[in-house]
């Protein structure tokens, strides 16, 4: 399937070079389009030309691009337009070994397949304590009954530790049972003045410490923590004290936007508003997938099918901009006048 996707991407990118009618195209573009268009026309009985000039010819070339991304993504959109009918024979065109694919497209698909098929540590965009259902006021001493050391979540990146006088304890549990981290990078600081249980201001004694695996860590210095070693805090003073723990970032095997080059830019290109036709077409295609129709996904796509579809749809979005197709789509009402921010804003609400 990688070769089919590489051919589809190659053909669409070749079509995207036809910005001007009289442009002198590269020889490899002529070779790619010459073979692809002939094969496509022969199997589908359509009449795509290599030099589209009229609106009808531009539509036909865009239909070919659309057929190819649907075939490569193994999607069937059904009846979405009175003017366009998906040609299921297109998969036979892309399976033709005579159609060449470029080194660039082959490398893109190889990277996509390789990265979506494995896992690697990457910096996560969300705070480590994002899933905490409850937070505590920052700088407010809080001690659970029967404990001398209590940890509390303040925000998605901040936690604090309340310690009784002379208290010592392991706070490793603060980092456990969440996010499956490979490495956590955090800083701890002494809270100089805090509010005690009665609401009065109180100073944290000097000499409070934090150690990881038995090694004391300096306050205000980033600590690389693997989540396995014990994390002990100690308040040797005669009064209550507090420290703050800020998780700067953490690494885990969850997929991010950096799993594939320019994935975030591809997603923006797919979900950007070009006109009502593109807005409706994108929704009609994504409606057959697990990706959102109109709003980018909260979490990065991580499986091969969705990442491949984003790459192919981004190339199709470029073809849409270059070929400027104009056809009817069920449920889409054309608008009059230029596209501005207000028009785009209205499309997403």
Curated annotation (Swiss-Prot):
GO terms for molecular function: host cell surface receptor binding; structural molecule activity. GO terms for biological process: fusion of virus membrane with host plasma membrane. Pfam families: Orbi_VP7. Glycans are attached at residues 148, 287. GO terms for cellular component: viral envelope; viral outer capsid. It comes from the Viruses. Its main location: virion. InterPro entries: Capsid_hemagglutn, Orbi_VP7_capsid, Orbi_VP7_capsid_C, Orbi_VP7_capsid_N, Virus_capsid_a-hlx_vir. Keywords: Capsid protein, Glycoprotein, Outer capsid protein, Virion. SUPFAM superfamilies: A virus capsid protein alpha-helical domain, Viral protein domain. It is found in: Virion. Belongs to the orbivirus VP7 family. The VP7 protein is one of the five proteins (with VP1, VP3, VP4, and VP6) which form the inner capsid of the virus. This is Core protein VP7.
